[in-house]
Each structure stands twice: as structure tokens, then as C-alpha cells.
Amino acid sequence: QKNGIISENGFNIKQLKDFQNLFEKKDYTCKLYNLHDEIQNLNLDDYKAHILVIKNGVKLFSEPDNIFNTLNNLKWDKKYFDLRRQKVLNKLARYNLCFSNFNQEPDYENKKGTIYNISDFDCLYKLNNGLKTFGEEFNNLECEGNYYFDIKKCGIGYHGDAERKKVIGCRFGESLDLNYWWYYQYKRLNNKITIPLDHGDIYIMDEKAS
């Protein structure tokens, strides 16, 4: 099940720098990662990607601990419909749920997961509305939650997301790395890029990074 309408364009480097400037004016520490530094010797001008990390940026809009506790107490989807096997299976890599402007009970047989109305949760609603004050680019966004219930065992492999162009993420709970690895013509290039994320951090990807 896909929620919302995919954006025509993702974020660009100018927008990321503008967001960085807005947060830094409010005394938040930011770091803009140039993911293409790892392949600069290959002269791949069209392969420029960036990700902006705002340390503890959630704090500007809402209390990270309250959000973590709220999320921790929700009912998460632990099952999904496997398209290849055509049956409902248990989730092993992570649990999921979504937030939108309506509620939905899961119906795994019909490929539908749990959706909560974000306005029912004050701490999340404040975060969502707070981001909107930074520009129209943050309007009409859908929200997906990924619960890595055991960070020593959980996780997903390297992938790109064709299903979305705008990516704004928040980290809650234990620190966890976000890793990138460049691929070109089906081959892995150079070194892994590791971006550390801590409780309360916000990260924003440009379109290529997503």
C-alpha cells in the first residue's frame, strides 16, 4: 500500500543549504555530507548526492523523549504480505507503521498495514507542523515509522527508494549509523560512507541521496 502522492521532485543542494542556515540561526549544529566525495576521481558529474544532518533538531519542535515513548507504546506491524510467496509472513528486519490524516487497521491479506492519524499524537503533530514552518517543501508529507527492535540484529541492505523522492528522517532511541555505498554499473565503488545518527537527530536527503 502506498500513501499519498509522490512528489515530482526531491530536495536539491540549495534547499539543503537553506535548511542548514535556518537551523544554524537557531543554534543547532548541522553537518552537510557530500556523498560524492567518495567517487570524485571518477568524474561522474551527474552523480552528486548530499544529506544534511541536524543534531538534536527534533528539539526545536517537540521533545524527543516524548516522541520515543509514544512510538514505543504503539502497536507496530509485525507481519506483511509477501508478494513473491503470496502469503502473510513475519517481519524480521524491522517493524513498521505509518502516520497520515486518517486511521487504518491492518489487513495484511489485502496488503494494508497500520496507519495512525498523526493529529492524535500531540508530540508528533508538533514536529510535523513545525517542519511546515520552514517552507512549502514540507507540506503534504506522509510519515513512515521503522522500528529496529534489536539494533544488533535488525537492519536492511543497501537500496534506493524509487517510491519516494523527498526524504526527511528522525532518529529516536539508541544511536545508529546510516550507511551509503556507491554502485556504478552494478559494481560497488571505493569505501562505505557512514553517517552517525543520535537520538533526536533530523536528516534530510537530496533527491540523489534518497
Question: What name fits each language-model region?
Answer:
Residues 1-210:
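Non-heme Fe(II) oxygenase metal-center motifs and adjacent flexible, charged/small-residue loops
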